Every structure is written in C-alpha cells, then in structure tokens.
Amino acid sequence: MSAFQNNVTIITGASTGIGEELAYRLAQQGAMLVLTARRLDELNRVADKARTFGAKVIIVSADVAKSDDCKKIIDTTINAFGRIDTLVCNAGMTMWAKFADIKDVSMLERIMQVNYMGAVYCTHYALPHLIASKGRIVGVASLTGLIGVPTRTGYAASKHAMRGFFDSLRIELADVGVSVTMIYPGFVATGIRENATGADGKPAKIDPVNKDDVMSVAECTDIIVRAIEARKREEIMTVKGKLGQWLKLIAPGVIDGMAKRAVEGNQKYVERL
C-alpha cells in the first residue's frame, strides 16, 4: 500500500508547475488533498483532474504571504479531514534582475513574504496537528537556496531563509516524530520563470533559461515523491547541484564563477530568441 493512502496532504502553490503535478501524483496514490493558491479558476481545474484519480480534494483560495490566509488553510483542512499528515510548502515567486537595476526594493519584500514567510505561517498553524500525526513537512526551495546567483538576489535570500528555518526546525522536531524534508530543484519546466519579476517590478514575460538545461516537471515530481515517502532530510537535484555543494566548501570562488557564467550564458540565449 502506498505511504500516501488516506494521507491528508496540503500543497501550497498547487495551481501550476510542481504543485500541480505533485497533486496528480499523490492523488493517484490515494492521498486526501488540500490544494491552495491564489487563482481559484486554476485551482478548480487542478482539483477536477485530481478527482479523476479517485482522490478526495478540497481547495482553498489563499495568499500565503498573509498570516490569516494561512490560518484559513489549516482550519479548513481540520474541519474537512480532522487531521494533517503532510504539509508541502511549495508556493513561490522569483525574479530576474540585478539588484542595482531594481526600481523599488519592496519587490524583494514581497518575494520574502511569499517564499519564506508563507512557509513559516503555514508551518506555524499546522505544527500542532503534524506533531499529533507524526507527519511530514516539506519545503520546496531551489538550488539558489544553497549558493548565490546573480540576478536572483531576493529569490536566493528567500530560499536561503527557508533552508535556515527548516534545518533548525528539523532539530527541534527530532524527538516528536515529525520529519522535515528540504527539496532543492534546479531549473524545472514550469511557468515560474516566465512570471518572474523584472527590475521594474512587473512580470518579465520571458524564460531566460536554455531549454537544454531544464528538467521536466514529471521527473522533478517523481524525485520529490520518493523523498517525501522516505522522509529524507534533503534532496538536491542534478549532478551540478550536488557538485556545487562540495565545491562551495572547498572552492567558493569557483562556484561564484560558474554562477556568473551560467547567467551570462542565459542572457545570450535570450538575445537569440
């Protein structure tokens, strides 16, 4: 029997990308799903498809940057299912702009609110229920949560913050049976980059990543599901990601150079489009 059979699972950022695909994978394994995002029409679309796999699904339209909305997610889940077994903090937004070019620094505050505080708020309200169920907490971060990347200052800061928070929380929860799994994807074929915030604070409307460097969302989600099921401490995707972790310790300047060249290469790719 699947580890997710009748597992009450909350997925934030479930209307597209990794969150959407994860909803389908867990629905197929018998999970009872609570899907949340801001766009109600997209949530309904995802929920309808998830139900075709026989899953029980409820949706909650919410902005995870708001504490009250996160409390609503948890309260709705408890009212519907009576418990929480897994919390997947997946909601996020990104950026493509050098810090010196940013017109209004408040855009970084919004990124931090969504990516970091959204995870903190949801975890705060869900934690008593997760302790009761000896459940799972999952933070979907990014390889930019492990290294610095130019043009991603605000995004990298938010993902580094997620890592610090969840790594610390894991230690606090070690004796109560709640696992904390951190996920570090590289570039994945989702819409997050096309909706990235540019220097002017508006969506950039272009994906600057060479398609040859992108992992499919299906492959990414397969890895995530296995990591959640195994209650792994962390899952660093791609060979480059794993190598980067070690190089950062022994040759941080090399990693800085690799990150710089990668961004410059992506810029040349955009110029050819």
Regions found by a protein language model. Give the residues of each.
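Conserved glycine-rich cofactor-binding loop
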Residues: 8, 15-17
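Conserved glycine-rich Rossmann-like NAD(P)H-binding loop of the short-chain dehydrogenase/reductase
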Residues: 29-46
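SDR active-site lid
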Residues: 175-239
